[in-house]
Structure formats: C-alpha cells, structure tokens
UniProtKB/Swiss-Prot annotation:
Catalytic activity: a 2-demethylmenaquinol + S-adenosyl-L-methionine = a menaquinol + S-adenosyl-L-homocysteine + H(+); a 2-methoxy-6-(all-trans-polyprenyl)benzene-1,4-diol + S-adenosyl-L-methionine = a 5-methoxy-2-methyl-3-(all-trans-polyprenyl)benzene-1,4-diol + S-adenosyl-L-homocysteine + H(+)
Protein name, per record: Ubiquinone/menaquinone biosynthesis C-methyltransferase UbiE
EC number: 2.1.1.163, 2.1.1.201
Function: Methyltransferase required for the conversion of demethylmenaquinol (DMKH2) to menaquinol (MKH2) and the conversion of 2-polyprenyl-6-methoxy-1,4-benzoquinol (DDMQH2) to 2-polyprenyl-3-methyl-6-methoxy-1,4-benzoquinol (DMQH2).
Keyword Lyase found: no
Enzyme class: transferase
Keywords, sorted A to Z: Menaquinone biosynthesis, Methyltransferase, S-adenosyl-L-methionine, Transferase, Ubiquinone biosynthesis
GO MF terms held by the record: 2-methoxy-6-polyprenyl-1,4-benzoquinol methyltransferase activity; demethylmenaquinone methyltransferase activity
Length: 269
C-alpha cells in the first residue's frame, strides 16, 4: 500500500482499534454488545438527519465540502451513459449529487443507507436539485448489500464506515458488488498527524462540538458519540490493511488537513 501525500495527556485519548477490527464492540468510548450497536447508531442518525450538514460542518470546521469535492475529483466519474456507482451510507446525497454533476448527468448513482430518515432528507434535496432521475434510493445494510455480484463501476462511502458494526463485512460486500476494474473510495475522519493540530483538534472536538451541538439541536449526546467514534476508528495504515485484506489491490490513501480526514482508494482487479 502507498500513502500519497503519542496520545499522552490529550483530551479524550483512547486506543484506536487495529487492522483486525473491533468497532462492533464500541459505541463511541462505551463498550457494547455487537448486537446493540446498530440500533444505537440508528438512533443517533434519526436525531441528526435534518441537521446533518450542520453536524459535518462542526466536525470538520466546514472542510468536509472541500474533502468531498476532492473525493469525487479523484474518482473521476465517467461521462459515458450506463456508468453506475453505489454510494453507501450516503443518505443525504452529498457524494451522489457531486458524482452526477461531474459526470455531466450521465452517471446513475444508487444511494444506500440503513437509516430511512437520512434517505428522506436526500430524496427531498435531490428533487429540489433536479437530480432525481439519475438516482435510486435504497434502505439496506452495508454488511448485506441487496445487489448481485459485479454490479457497479464504483463504490463510495463518506464518513459512514466507522458507524458500521462489522467493517470487514462491509468491505467484503463492497468488493463483491464492484465490477472487475471497479474502484472503491472511502472518505473518513482519521488520525491527525501534525503535533500541534492534533491537540487543537482534540480540544475543539471534545470541548466545543458537543456544546455547540446542544445549542443548535438540543442534543449533545449524539455529537459526543460522533466525536468518540472518530477516535476509535483505525489509523490510516491499519484501515488500508483492512481494505487489502478484503481483496482490493493498488490500495493507497491521501491525508486531508493534516490527517483530520483521509481518503482511501482500492481497485477490484
């Protein structure tokens, strides 16, 4: 794999899970039974669905929009008719809309999310943007995709895979539904690698985000979970190893904003 481009005394310091996984037993910093996690995560996203963009603005200081643009630019969606993409955990449509627009409205994107509230927001936005004809909305689980093998030219997931209980299953399903030659791209909050920025970002995340979330939405707990889930997610190198283990080749990643987020790529060859 290639890269392009000490938690001591830090606020909220926690050990991240490694390449062997373990996210199924953590709901943020809280240890839970793996059968509980999906329901707990669903509750969070039912609560934040209407204000999901605000949530991402808080988590990234507004940078998520730039990162998403870069993600779609690296994907380079085809402008040929019939090119298809699956956007998982994509309920509100941010990535799918960009793909359709960059493709000159040639691409067909299936937006899949386990949360109906998020899909409802995405469908409303798609209608307002006039993009509904290029989109399909599917409520389903990333660990058990309702599609045949070799169905899609691309698979994208942005800020969603850390909320999947069994990440290894989601990666295996991504590999299965991609066509030979298909591309996997995952954008996710990650391990900050700049010594000063990591401390600043921790202070912002643990001190400010839950308080601001409560002021705006009346809900601090959901924002605390989202911050904590970022700190449990595997480091860049460990997640890249998980992607390789699922069968992908030419695995690489790019750090954004000092590692606050990372964009991972792999190919089904």
């Amino acid at each position: 794999m290639s890269q392009q481009n000490g938690n001591v005394n830090r606020v909220g310091a926690q050990d991240r899970v490694g390449a062997s996984g373990g996210m199924e037993h953590s709901f943020g910093f809280k240890a839970v039974d793996e059968n509980e996690k999906q329901g707990l995560v669903n509750d969070v996203f039912h609560k934040v669905a209407k204000r999901y963009d605000i949530m991402n603005d808080l988590m990234s200081a507004g940078m998520h929009r730039v990162w998403k643009d870069a993600m779609v630019a690296w994907l380079t969606p085809s402008k040929r008719p019939g090119w298809t993409s699956l956007d998982v955990a994509g309920g509100t449509g941010d990535i799918a809309f960009r793909i359709v627009e960059v493709s000159g409205r040639q691409a067909h994107v299936t937006i899949l999310d386990i949360n109906g509230s998020m899909l409802g927001v995405g469908r409303e936005r798609a209608i307002k943007k006039g993009l509904i004809d290029n989109l399909e909305f599917v409520e389903a689980n990333a660990e058990e995709l309702p599609f045949e093998d070799n169905s899609f030219d691309a698979y994208t997931i942005a800020f969603g895979i850390r909320n999947v209980p069994h990440i290894d299953k989601a990666l295996s399903e991504a590999y299965r539904v991609l066509k030979p030659g298909g591309r996997f791209l995952c954008l996710e909050f990650s391990e900050v690698e700049l010594p000063v920025l990591d401390k600043v970002y921790d202070e912002w995340s643990f001190r400010a985000i839950p308080r601001i979330g409560k002021m705006i939405t009346g809900d601090a707990d959901s924002y605390s979970y989202l911050v904590e889930s970022i700190r449990k997610f595997p480091k860049q190198q460990d997640f890249a190893a998980m992607i390789e283990k699922a069968g992908f080749e030419r695995v690489s990643y790019r750090n954004f904003t000092g590692g606050i987020a990372a964009l991972h790529s792999g190919w089904k060859l």
